[in-house]
Amino acid sequence: MTEDIQLRLVRALPFEGNTAWNYRGICDVHHTIYYILAGDGHIRTEKGALDLEPGRVYLISRGLPHDLWCDTHIRKTYMDFHVELFPGCDALAEAGEVRSLPAGREACQRIFDAAQRKTLRDRTFLRGQLLTAVAAFMPDNLPGISPAMQPFLPIVEEMRRNLSASIRREEIAARYGWNPSSFSRAFRRAFGCGFKQYQERLLTERIAEELLVSNKTLQTIAEGYGFCDAYYLSAFFKRTMGTSPAIYRKQHER
């Protein structure tokens, strides 16, 4: 494989909490890494509960339903991120379990301190730590970009740059010289899903990111991504994520 990955760090934040840190039924569109500094936190998936041990780094893969809580307190740094071969093609296999590696308490403390300071040097350091962790968790047999995907790479890059609910398959196909029916069949063969499903996944990820890192109103987000109004955006998000934008924002104050 000769492709390089595209690493996008959504946010890296320090967190200190008590028993109010208690969330059920979380399922994210991004990956999350925890560097645990102190406390008695736990995570539960369908495979059972796991202690979040100080001095370790944990990967919670996108699409993994889980619960989070602590007995008395938790002190950690968390990083939400995407890592892709190209938009929509994840470079970390979605896992049915939480993965963990030793990091050391000193390393966890340095990462926590850097996340608090947020200088350019600190942000660069955090990105480097994240890249190191991603490399450690990445599978050896990661598939590359198939020949069937190659013709669509400019298209998905354009979708990423101009992401909108108003994008239409017919318009994209015509702009790149495809018959719409042939385009749909070839796209599905290459990616294992239809164009609309792929588009909705990218759009859901982007809206979720806006909800996490900005204070924009739903109306502002709706206007920015081609929805008629906040009601239609909320309905779309609830259909694709299973929860409302307001609840999603509240769940991720962690």
Regions found by a protein language model. Name each.
Residues R44, P87-D90, A186, Y198, ...:
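Residues that scaffold the ATP/ADP-binding catalytic core of kinase and kinase-like folds
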Residues D4-E97:
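N-terminal regulatory/effector-sensing and dimerization cores
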Residues T77-E84, S100-S164, E170-E171, R175-S184:
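An amphipathic alpha-helical interaction segment
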Residues G39, G55-R56, F183, I207, ...:
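Short hydrophobic/aromatic patches on the structural cores and recognition surfaces of FHA
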Residues L64, P139, R254:
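Flexible, active-site-proximal loop/turn residues at the rims of small-molecule/cofactor binding pockets
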Residues G17, G41, L120, L142, ...:
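Generic structural signal for secondary-structure transition and capping sites
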